[in-house]
Amino acid sequence: MTASQAKKELMRRALEIDPTVHVGKDGVDENLNNEVVQQLKKRRLIKVTVLNNAEADTKTVAEDIAAATGSVIVDVRGGVIILTDKRTWDSQCQKKSDN
């Protein structure tokens, strides 16, 4: 499976989940990163919402969280970030197509 197919599959799965982490005016800090790591261990695919009062833009927040937690950015749209853990991303990319 190519990276684009893996991304498509993970985005399809993300439609069924609600955001579990919210980034507010405090931005990305150690507590937020710890929460993201815990959520990824439990769920392997999470949505993060960046609220309007956050000082940084969504793309910057996504890059900061991914760098601090070792996660992979699946998609960034509007104020929503979809993240997955590295292991899930690698396993999705290595799956064979059912063709």
Label each region the model flagged.
Residues M1-N99:
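Positively charged, polar, low-complexity stretches
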